[in-house]
C-alpha cells in the first residue's frame, strides 16, 4: 500500500507571511501603485486622538471595501469571512495570521456615519488622476451609456403615486428660442408654467405623472425589462475613455431615461478632460444632445435609427425643404408653410386645404379630415442632420464600432467579475457610494496591472540594453 502523507493540520510552523503571497498577486501590484498618506490626512479630523478607545485604522477599512469590489465579493459580511482565511488579503491589510480582522459592521458604520459623504468620490478621482499622470488615459473619445442594477426591493410591494413631472435641463433655453420664433410669426409667446425664478430661466412644469414607487426602497424605479419582466432597479449612467478607464458616473432610479441623466455625466467629464468625440447609442439621439455637443465643439457619434412612423404613405424625406422660403414641398408640388412653433420646440407646417381636397394622393399622404397635411420638424433639427452626416463618415463608423470594446466591456466586467448585477444597498446615496467604489476598484485594477507590465518591460529592457539608464518610473 502507498505510504500516504500524514495529517499536518496541527503541525506548528514558523512562517513568513511575506513569502506566502505570490510575487505577481494582484494585491501586490496594487500596493505598489497606491499611496495612503492623503487618506490619513483627509480622515484625521474624524478621529479623536486623546479620548476614548483606539479606533480602527481607516485605511484598513477602505482596503477591506476595495478587496470586496476587486474580487467581486457580494457583501461586506462575506468579505469579512474571506479575509479571515485568505493569506493575501491579510497581507494587504497588514495583519498577521492570528490578528483579529475588523468586523464588517465597523466598516459599514464608518462609511455610513463617520467618513464624509464625498470620500468615495475623492477616492475615485485620486485613482483616476494617478492613471492620468501616468499617461494611461485617452479621453480624446469618450463613450457614454447606462446599465441597470437590480435593486434590493420586492417588485410586488409598491404603490402608485402622482409626482410632479421634472423639468428638463434645457427647457428654459428651448422656451426662449420658441418664443423668438413665435414672435416672428406674429404668435403670442408661450408663458412659463412655473415661477420666473426657475433655475433654468423658466420652463418648469406643473404636470404630474403616475409612477410605481417601491415601499421597500422608494429611491429605485420600476424598470421594464423585455415584454413581460419588470423589476425595481437603479441605473448607472457611465462614461469611459478609449482604453476602458471609467471617467464619470451618475446613478439614478431605473426608470430615468438615458437622455435625461446625460447632462450631468457629460458636463462632469468634459469639464475635466479635453474631449473631441462623444460616442453614444440610439437612446441619446435627441435634438438637445446633438445641439449641446456640437455647440461645445465636440463631435457626437450616434448610430442609425430606424424610421418609427407609418410604413404606408409618404416618408419625411419625401418632402423637400426650401430654407430660403422656409417651406416644405410635397411630392405633388404643394407647399407646406410654417404656421407656428409649439412649446415642445416642434415647427408645424400646414398645406392649403383647397389644393389638397382634390388631390388623388390625399389618403396616401395622411391628410387630416379637413384635407390638410400637417408636417412637423424640431427647432433643432439641423443639429440632427449634422449628426446623421457624421454617422456616414469612415471615422464616425470606426469610433462607434469601439463601443463594444469600451463601455460595453466595462459593464460586462462590472457584472461578471465585480458583482454589479444587483445591490444589497438601499437608498440612492448608498447605491451611488457603492457604484463609485466599484468603479474606483476597476480603475485601480487596470492601473496596477498596466503599471506592473510596464515595470517588467522596463526591467527586461534595461537588462538587455545596459546603456539605457532612463527607464520610465511610476508617477505618484
Task: Tell what function each PLM region has.
Residues 3-6, 72-85, 96-476:
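Anion-binding and metal-coordination hotspots
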Residues 89-93:
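Short amphipathic alpha-helical interface patches used for protein-protein assembly/oligomerization
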Amino acid at each position: 500500500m502507498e505510504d500516504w502523507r500524514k495529517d499536518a493540520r496541527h503541525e506548528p510552523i514558523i512562517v513568513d507571511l511575506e513569502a506566502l503571497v505570490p510575487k505577481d498577486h494582484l494585491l501586490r501590484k496594487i500596493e505598489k501603485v497606491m499611496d495612503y498618506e492623503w487618506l490619513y490626512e483627509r480622515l484625521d479630523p474624524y478621529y479623536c486622538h486623546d479620548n476614548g478607545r483606539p479606533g480602527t485604522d481607516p485605511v484598513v477599512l477602505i482596503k477591506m471595501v476595495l478587496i470586496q469590489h476587486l474580487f467581486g465579493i457580494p457583501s461586506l459580511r462575506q468579505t469579512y469571512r474571506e479575509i479571515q482565511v485568505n493569506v493575501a488579503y491579510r497581507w494587504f491589510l497588514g495583519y498577521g495570521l492570528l490578528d483579529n480582522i475588523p468586523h464588517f459592521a465597523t466598516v459599514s458604520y464608518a462609511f455610513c456615519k463617520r467618513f464624509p459623504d464625498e470620500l468615495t468620490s475623492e477616492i475615485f478621482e485620486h485613482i483616476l488622476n494617478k492613471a492620468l499622470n501616468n499617461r494611461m488615459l485617452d479621453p480624446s473619445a469618450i463613450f457614454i451609456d447606462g446599465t441597470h442594477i437590480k435593486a434590493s426591493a420586492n417588485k410586488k410591494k409598491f404603490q402608485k403615486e402622482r409626482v410632479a413631472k421634472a423639468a428638463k435641463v434645457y427647457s428654459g433655453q428651448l422656451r426662449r428660442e420658441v418664443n423668438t420664433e413665435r414672435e416672428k410669426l406674429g404668435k403670442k409667446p408661450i408663458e412659463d408654467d412655473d415661477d420666473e425664478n426657475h433655475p433654468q430661466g423658466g420652463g418648469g412644469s406643473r404636470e404630474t405623472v403616475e409612477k410605481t414607487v417601491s415601499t421597500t426602497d422608494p429611491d429605485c424605479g420600476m424598470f421594464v425589462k423585455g415584454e413581460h419582466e419588470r423589476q425595481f432597479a437603479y441605473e448607472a449612467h457611465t462614461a469611459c475613455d478609449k482604453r476602458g478607464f471609467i471617467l464619470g458616473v451618475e446613478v439614478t432610479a431605473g426608470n430615468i431615461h438615458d437622455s435625461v441623466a446625460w447632462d450631468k455625466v457629460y458636463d462632469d467629464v468634459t469639464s475635466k478632460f479635453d474631449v473631441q468625440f462623444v460616442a453614444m447609442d440610439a437612446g441619446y439621439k435627441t435634438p438637445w444632445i446633438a445641439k449641446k455637443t456640437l455647440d461645445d465643439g465636440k463631435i457626437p457619434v450616434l448610430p442609425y435609427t430606424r424610421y418609427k412612423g407609418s410604413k404606408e404613405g409618404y416618408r419625411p424625406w419625401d418632402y423637400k425643404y426650401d430654407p430660403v422660403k422656409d417651406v416644405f414641398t410635397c411630392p405633388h408640388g404643394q407647399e407646406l408653410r410654417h404656421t407656428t412653433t409649439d412649446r415642445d420646440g416642434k415647427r408645424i407646417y400646414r398645406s392649403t386645404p383647397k389644393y389638397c381636397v382634390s388631390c388623388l394622393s390625399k389618403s396616401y399622404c395622411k391628410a387630416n379630415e379637413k384635407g390638410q397635411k400637417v408636417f412637423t420638424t424640431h427647432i433643432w433639427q439641423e443639429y440632427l442632420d449634422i449628426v446623421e452626416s457624421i454617422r456616414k463618415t469612415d471615422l464616425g463608423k470606426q469610433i462607434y464600432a469601439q463601443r463594444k470594446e469600451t463601455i460595453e466591456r466595462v459593464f460586462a466586467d462590472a457584472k461578471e467579475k465585480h458583482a454589479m448585477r444587483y445591490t444589497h444597498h438601499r437608498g440612492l446615496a448608498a447605491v451611488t457610494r457603492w457604484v463609485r467604489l466599484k468603479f474606483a476598484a476597476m480603475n485601480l485594477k487596470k492601473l496596477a496591472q498596466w503599471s506592473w507590465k510596464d515595470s517588467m518591460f522596463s526591467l527586461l529592457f534595461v537588462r538587455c540594453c545596459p546603456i539605457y539608464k532612463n527607464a520610465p518610473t511610476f508617477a505618484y
